[in-house]
Amino acid sequence: MKVRPSVKKMCEHCKVVRRKGRVMIICSANPKHKQRQG
């Protein structure tokens, strides 16, 4: 899980989701792409 000030999709499998007011990226193909804004 990367924590970044700005999150971007890193590949076509990445999805933007909002959980508890936080913007997160989840990726089914590459778990390294998981990110959270904060």
Swiss-Prot record:
Similarity comment: family membership: Belongs to the bacterial ribosomal protein bL36 family.
Superkingdom, natural source: Bacteria
Any Pfam family the entry gives: Ribosomal_L36
InterPro entries xref list: Ribosomal_bL36, Ribosomal_bL36_sp
Record GO biological process: translation
Record protein name field: Large ribosomal subunit protein bL36
Example GO molecular function: structural constituent of ribosome
Gene name of the encoded protein: rpmJ
Keywords: Ribonucleoprotein, Ribosomal protein
PROSITE patterns linked to this entry: RIBOSOMAL_L36
Top-level taxonomy: Bacteria, Bacillati, Bacillota, Bacilli, Lactobacillales
GO cellular component: cytoplasm; ribonucleoprotein complex; ribosome
Organism: Lacticaseibacillus paracasei (strain ATCC 334 / BCRC 17002 / CCUG 31169 / CIP 107868 / KCTC 3260 / NRRL B-441) (Lactobacillus paracasei)
Disulfide bonds: none
